[in-house]
Design a protein with these regions (language model features):
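Short amphipathic secondary-structure patches
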Residues: 55-108
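Intrinsically disordered, low-complexity segments enriched in polar/charged residues with Gly/Pro
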Residues: 32-34, 83-84, 120-121
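Alpha-helical assembly-interface signal, strongest on the long, hydrophobic N-terminal helix that forms
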Residues: 1-77
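Solvent-exposed, flexible loop/coil residues
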Residues: 20-21, 45-46, 78, 116, ...
């Protein structure tokens, strides 16, 4: 009986190595996803700050004729230009701004390369953020 057990165990030699390698690969994939998704959250936070700043810059462009008539309204063309100008120094982003007399809407998008998810075929991620701002009386 002892000899039968030894013969059986010799046939399974190295099976733990394969299981260990598969477990290590799975852990690396989870770690890669965590690193890249964490990076995506940081990029989104930065984009959100940029969009907020650009929308606020646009919301400061008031229509002077409307002010003289006692109304608080934006000059849409100047508001859109100011919002896009506020984003002009930010590298690697795509920006879109729309303005009406009531508000400014800004959307920014950035594509960035992944670090470890590239190993499973996901070479880059796209993250976007948007913000709205409207003028208010003090």
């Amino acid at each position: 009986m002892n000899r039968a057990v030894q013969t059986r165990l010799r046939g399974e030699r190295g099976s733990v190595l394969i299981s260990g390698m598969l477990l290590t690969l799975a852990l690396l994939m989870v770690l890669g996803a965590a690193v890249d998704i964490g990076h995506a959250f940081i990029v989104r936070r930065d984009l959100s700050s940029l969009a907020d700043g650009a929308a606020l810059a646009g919301a400061q462009q008031l229509d002077q004729q409307a002010i003289h008539q006692g109304q608080l309204a934006l000059d849409p063309q100047q508001a859109q230009a100011a919002a896009l100008s506020a984003l002009s120094g930010a590298p690697g982003i795509q920006a879109h701004a729309e303005a009406t007399p009531e508000q400014v809407h800004v959307q920014v998008t950035r594509r960035f390369p992944t670090i470890l998810l590239r190993l499973v075929g996901l070479a880059d991620l796209t993250v976007s953020a948007q913000a709205n701002a409207a003028p208010r009386a003090p």
